[in-house]
Swiss-Prot record:
The gene is Get1. It comes from the Eukaryota. Gene3D superfamilies: Helix hairpin bin (1.10.287.660). The lineage of its organism: Eukaryota, Metazoa, Chordata, Craniata, Vertebrata. Its main location: endoplasmic reticulum. Component of the Golgi to ER traffic (GET) complex, which is composed of GET1, CAMLG/GET2 and GET3. Within the complex, GET1 and CAMLG form a heterotetramer which is stabilized by phosphatidylinositol binding and which binds to the GET3 homodimer. Interacts with CAMLG/GET2 (via C-terminus). GET3 shows a higher affinity for CAMLG than for GET1. The chain crosses the membrane at residues 9-29, 100-120, 149-169. Residues 39-94 form a coiled coil. One of its GO terms (molecular function) is protein-membrane adaptor activity. Residues 1-8, 121-148 are lumenal. Keywords: Coiled coil, Endoplasmic reticulum, Membrane, Transmembrane, Transmembrane helix. Belongs to the WRB/GET1 family. InterPro entries: Get1, Helix_hairpin_bin_sf. GO terms for cellular component: endoplasmic reticulum membrane; GET complex. This is Guided entry of tail-anchored proteins factor 1.
Length: 174
């Protein structure tokens, strides 16, 4: 394929990239949750701690407070200590999960921005499509930016339009 043939298909390339980025943006929370779960294996330890707390609470319910106060108090302190330990463990895991999700989101948006900038750089002087100039008469210079071709649709305008259209189409899925 020659350079002029690839320039002719620039509109489809931009549309595909914009569509892909918007689909990934919708799937970003699910994707980051999955990656976080893969990276964190502490949930098993938390469920084990919860099971221990439940068994101790069941044992506590069988102990008579009046007859065996020392055993009852010891078991209650043990439950409180284990509950506090579980709470701190959950807080630490939640903070780490938030950091992982934030990093994934930032990485995605940086990648998306780099992709859009590279598309604008590559197709800076080439119109993505050319339509009769009377169709876009009041806005022809704005729409043609940065190509300066009469009736041309510049890559920046095309990216904005594609982003809006794809966002509207994918809105029910988000």
């Amino acid at each position: 394929m020659s350079a002029s043939e690839t320039d002719r298909w620039a509109w489809l390339l931009v549309l595909c990239f914009v569509f892909g980025c918007n689909v990934l943006r919708i799937l970003l929370p699910t994707l980051s949750s999955f990656i976080s779960r893969v990276l964190q294996k502490d949930a098993e330890q938390e469920s084990q701690m919860r099971a221990e707390i439940q068994s101790m609470k069941q044992e506590l319910s069988t102990v008579n407070m009046m007859d065996e106060f020392a055993r009852y108090a010891r078991l209650e302190r043990k439950i409180n200590k284990m509950t506090d330990k579980l709470k701190t463990h959950v807080k630490a895991r939640t903070a780490q999960l938030a950091k992982i999700k934030w990093f994934i989101s930032v990485a995605f948006y940086v990648l998306q921005a780099a992709l859009m900038i590279s598309l604008i750089w590559k197709y800076y002087s080439v119109p993505v499509a050319v339509v009769p100039s009377k169709w876009i008469t009041p806005l022809d210079r704005l729409v043609a930016f940065p190509t300066r071709v009469a009736g041309g649709i510049g890559v920046t305008c095309w990216i904005l339009v594609c982003n809006k259209v794809v966002a509207i189409i994918l809105h029910p899925f988000s």
